Amino acid sequence: MESYKPVWLKGAVILAINLIDKGYKPVAVGLGERDFYIDVKSDTSITLDEVKKAINENVLANVPIENNQIVYKGNKVSIIEDKVSISTNLNPKYFEILNISTHHPNPNEQYVRIRGVAFETEEQLKDYLTWLEKAEETDHRLIGEKLDLFSFHEEAGSGLVLFHPKGQTIRNELIAFMREINDSMGYQEVYTSHVFKTDIWKISGHYTLYRDKLIVFNMEGDEYGVKPMNCPAHILIYKSKPRTYRDLPIRFSEFGHVYRWEKKGELYGLLRVRGFVQDDGHIFLREDQLREEIKMLISKTVEVWHKFGFKDDDIKPYLSTRPDESIGSDELWEKATNALISALQESGLKFGIKEKEGAFYGPKIDFEIRDSLGRWWQLSTIQVDFNLPERFKLEYIDKDGIKKRPVMVHRAIYGSIDRFVAILLEHFKGKLPTWLSSVQVRVLPITDEVNEYAEKVLNDMRKRRIRAEIDYAGETLSKRIKNAYDQGVPYILIVGKKEASEGTVTVRARGNIEVRNVKFEKFLELLITEIAQRDVEQTTVKALK
């Protein structure tokens, strides 16, 4: 999606100017995950046909932009986008309006929101619309509703997700896996508050450079902020007692809740929310330990993505360099950048460069992952930071008794766990691997006469911590099988009189695979192994065939 966004933004600007020429009053343009949007004052009605007519109008050669606003014929239209710039080289001619709806930025205002896409060639537009049709079939928002995983409620607030029991099960499994990865690297897990005085954000630089996303309030004369990052809190834990060179590296991990005030037009299901959980980690270490630490992080990151079935061709690291707005000296930035380059080169990974896309406090390695629909998602990040240790005056005692500054590394492998859930749901089309599935087995007794045996099968699985359910014979067997498939259940066990008398089950798996006369204990043993190994494929049914 990222590669399309510059031409979409240019298309939105062009359409906004043409709408002004038609007498309408657009107030803002911006980008969503899959399209552009234009908000228009709703004091006059606007139809799809009228928008389409505006598309075909002549376009100004040079778009008048001042202070991130379109300034045209006395109108000022805000450009709600800070990552994509408007290119004079792009010339979108082929538009598709996807949706026109009512948008309420607050209770007292109402706009008409136009969503669409724009491309330079007709072929690009056709290809995208074909892809979009496939993508809509696997939209995580629809899957989440269908599988009863999560929900959003306006009365709770935009961009604030409520995970239901089945959705929380998926999150718990992801967290348990990452805990094992963290343990293998020597991390110590911590917990920090959701709210801090803004003093620490002022020291860190977030207060100035991240101010538009900070949620700030005053209580009893002090100013507080809901945390957008976990790093300052981990720094305070490091500072809580003296450290020596023998203590380093010190690795803290946290499944930390963070909150960022994203603009309402940018919110999109779990992919863009205002509150989420990061699999966050911070390492404090000596300069001489940096390269090996980065190499280990790169190796573990690739290992994690392989576990989810992503191949080497689906994993692409990028080095992101110093942005225009940053803190720290040229010398520190050069040191940090060179450390990342060395680790990438020694890891043997081919990597790209993203100029000026580093964090404000240091350069970083970002990993992009390609899903089953061919989309690239930025997920993992590894960031070297010489600046925050300086700002917070972090120290350790060297072997010579001299106080020195540690280096700090920020890292997250999933990134946002909530966002990663969305990506997995779309990547697997709702059919998650068995270990991640909220319901792993559903037992279907053919008649009520075998309910006792079916319940024994169910309870034996639950004793072994397998997430199993039973669907009694209230509907036809074929209907219950279809329900289980539609709800993403990996394994269905069908039991009738024959199975009850022989201690067997009929196993059905995805892909309409059926294996009869399977000893229940054998199935159970294989399933436990599949789950314990976190296999992506259904290895149990493969072993039974």
Curated annotation (Swiss-Prot):
Cofactor: record remark: Binds 1 zinc ion per subunit.
Cellular component, GO, one term: cytoplasm
PROSITE patterns listed in its UniProt record: AA_TRNA_LIGASE_II
Keyword terms of this UniProt record: Aminoacyl-tRNA synthetase, ATP-binding, Cytoplasm, Ligase, Metal-binding, Nucleotide-binding, Protein biosynthesis, RNA-binding, tRNA-binding, Zinc
Compartments, as annotated in UniProt: Cytoplasm
Cysteines paired by S-S bonds: none
Primary residence: cytoplasm
GO molecular function: ATP binding; metal ion binding; threonine-tRNA ligase activity; tRNA binding
Cofactor(s) required, per the database record: Zn(2+)
EC number, UniProt record: 6.1.1.3
Residues that bind Zn(2+): C231, H282, H410
GO biological-process terms attached to the record: threonyl-tRNA aminoacylation
Uppermost EC category: ligase
Keyword Nucleus: no
Catalyses which reaction(s): tRNA(Thr) + L-threonine + ATP = L-threonyl-tRNA(Thr) + AMP + diphosphate + H(+)
Region: Catalytic, residue numbers: 139-433
Alphabetical list of InterPro entries matching this protein: aa-tRNA-synt_IIb, aa-tRNA-synth_II, aa-tRNA-synth_II/BPL/LPL, Anticodon-bd, Anticodon-bd_dom_sf, Thr-tRNA-ligase_IIa, Thr/Ala-tRNA-synth_IIc_edit, ThrRS_anticodon
SUPFAM superfamilies associated with the record: Class II aaRS ABD-related, Class II aaRS and biotin synthetases, ThrRS/AlaRS common domain
Quaternary structure and interacting proteins, as annotated: Homodimer. Probably interacts with its editing subunit.
Family per record: Belongs to the class-II aminoacyl-tRNA synthetase family.
Role summary: Catalyzes the attachment of threonine to tRNA(Thr) in a two-step reaction: L-threonine is first activated by ATP to form Thr-AMP and then transferred to the acceptor end of tRNA(Thr). Also activates L-serine and transfers it to tRNA(Thr) but cannot deacylate incorrectly charged amino acid; unlike most archaea the editing function is found in a freestanding protein.
Name of the protein this chain belongs to: Threonine--tRNA ligase catalytic subunit
Source organism: Saccharolobus islandicus (strain M.16.27)
Gene behind this protein: thrS-cat
